[in-house]
């Protein structure tokens, strides 16, 4: 218990007749919440980047298949368009989920960073993602 208290946890109690310890964890500070929101934004950008790489790889495979005549152009063109639609849908979902997580983390301290995020916020209100991360 003393080691736990030395590491900054002030409310540490041993539960009577048990080997369990009850530790009261303090609420995060505003700076910590901002760091969490920043990390959420970073994860969001990383996921969008991975999706772009996946799409690029798939398009390269389609081009290679066209060059080797494994597939016909009338098949490749809709496939590329479908990939584009899938990417746009995935990016939209990632942004909605990221926005909801930041709103949940920051609570009343949340503010939109730009007009695009404001539009996304209006879309989020009508989205099933609005129920995510509710406490």
Give residue spans per PLM region.
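Ribosome-associated translation termination/rescue signal centered on the conserved GGQ peptidyl-tRNA hydrolysis loop
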Residues: 1-33
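Positively charged, low-complexity, intrinsically disordered RNA-binding extensions
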Residues: 21-135
């Amino acid at each position: 218990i003393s080691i736990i208290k030395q590491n900054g946890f002030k409310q540490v109690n041993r539960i009577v007749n048990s080997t369990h310890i009850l530790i009261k964890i303090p609420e995060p500070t505003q700076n910590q919440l901002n760091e969490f929101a920043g990390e959420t934004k970073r994860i969001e950008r990383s996921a969008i980047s991975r999706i772009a790489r996946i799409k690029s790889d798939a398009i390269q495979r389609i081009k290679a298949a066209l060059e080797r005549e494994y597939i016909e152009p009338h098949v490749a063109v809709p496939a590329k368009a479908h990939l584009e639609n899938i990417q746009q849908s995935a990016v939209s979902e990632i942004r909605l989920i990221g926005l909801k997580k930041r709103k949940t983390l920051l609570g009343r301290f949340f503010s939109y960073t730009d007009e695009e995020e404001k539009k996304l916020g209006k879309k989020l209100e009508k989205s099933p993602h609005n129920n995510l991360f509710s406490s």
